[in-house]
Amino acid sequence: MDCNMVSSFPWDWENLIMSNQSKTENEKKQQSTEWEFEKGEGIESIVPDFLGFEKVSSGSATSFWHTAVSKSSQSTSINSSSPEDKRCNLASQSSPGDSSSNIDFLQVKPSTALEVPIASAESDLCLKLGKRTYSEEFWGRNNNDLSAVSMNLLTPSVVARKKTKSCGQSMQVPRCQIDGCELDLSSSKDYHRKHRVCETHSKCPKVVVSGLERRFCQQCSRFHAVSEFDEKKRSCRKRLSHHNARRRKPQGVFPLNSERVFDRRQHTSMLWNGLSLNTRSEEKYTWGTTYETKPTQMESGFTLSFQRGNGSEDQLFTGSTLSFSAFQTSGGFSAGKSNIQLPDKGVGECSGGLHESHDFYSALSLLSTTSDSQGIKHTPVAEPPPIFGTFPSHFI
């Protein structure tokens, strides 16, 4: 008996401990649900807070609480289910025939534990669709919080993209493209890294690129065939020709200045078949001051007229001008008009045939003899040679 009693005590203590633990667990589960209700119809009551959800119901609260207490085992299953399952389980607690136990859920407020992942998923969805939603009323957040969440979502992708780009650039090491060289150009000049040629091969007269003999042109910065280069030239022939053409100065065409070639005092212009002929010759005359003559008709057909000049007797001057305007005919020179221009002294005109040049000079001598009776002295010192119908070839 004693042994049985002694042996039964440990078994009873174990059963007692197990039963006490199950009772304490049930009490904790019942205490976790806070019930707040008021009796009467039409009064709003609050459903117990399961995992942060507050449910507002209306109707007969007394019948609803009795059904909820009688099925407390079902309330424990609600804690481990989703919000939609909770809504279905709470609706199934009331009997289908009882109209007073109808529950209307007006407002659902999720707890803060579920708020963060849902908000991040929603903002990610909005960024993918290219839209902007305003969920301040539902989530209780402002625009600054939403923008902060979107920036946090964007920054990892941008950083990852930059990292991949930098990794890709670091993987491409510049090397010389000459066959058999493949020199690392990371420490070379920018020019050689850009064109992928080392400094030694850029000056070589002949290199092999992709199995072909080439030479690097320093002005084109490209590889050309060896035949396009001259000896001891680092640039191709085509580029050198353009370069030399730019450096050469164009030779300007200087116009012919007649004043520098010909003397003003011996300038001659002629009219041959319609070109005028002007000749200048130096003559020396002595004119008086006390005379006034009228045009005199000569026997040879010349008409001479002189204007009064201003000067002293026996004055010697030069620069007289003898000009003729003539036209060529089949029988020689036709009758034309001759002007004798004397600077600062007057103008003498004569009209007649140029073929009578001898008579013209004889008329001048007659004029000098007739003027002696009137007190005028006209003594030609030098006479120009007679003009004939032949002219030098350089006047034509």
Curated annotation (Swiss-Prot):
* Zn-finger (SBP-type) residues: 173-250
Q: Which cofactor does it need?
A: Zn(2+)
Q: Name one GO biological process term.
A: regulation of DNA-templated transcription
Give the location in the cell: Nucleus
Its cellular-component GO annotations read: nucleus
Q: Which residues bind Zn(2+) 1?
A: 176, 181, 198, 201
Annotated signal peptide? none
Q: What induces it?
A: Negatively regulated by microRNAs miR156 and miR157.
Major location category of this protein: nucleus
Pfam families per the UniProt record, alphabetical: SBP (PF03110)
Which keywords does this Swiss-Prot/TrEMBL entry list?
A: DNA-binding, Metal-binding, Nucleus, Transcription, Transcription regulation, Zinc, Zinc-finger
Q: Where is this region: Disordered?
A: 74-104
Task: Supply the SUPFAM superfamilies for this chain.
Answer: SBT domain (SSF103612)
Asked whether the keyword S-adenosyl-L-methionine is assigned, the reply is no
Q: What are this entry's molecular-function GO terms?
A: DNA-binding transcription factor activity; sequence-specific DNA binding; zinc ion binding
Q: How is the cofactor bound, in the record's words?
A: Binds 2 Zn(2+) ions per subunit.
Query: Which domain of life does the protein's organism represent?
Result: Eukaryota
The record's comment about this protein's domains reads: The SBP-type zinc finger is required for the binding to DNA.
Describe the function of this protein.
Trans-acting factor that binds specifically to the consensus nucleotide sequence 5'-TNCGTACAA-3'.
Protein name (database record): Squamosa promoter-binding-like protein 10
Q: What is the lineage of its organism?
A: Eukaryota, Viridiplantae, Streptophyta, Embryophyta, Tracheophyta
Gene designation per UniProt: SPL10
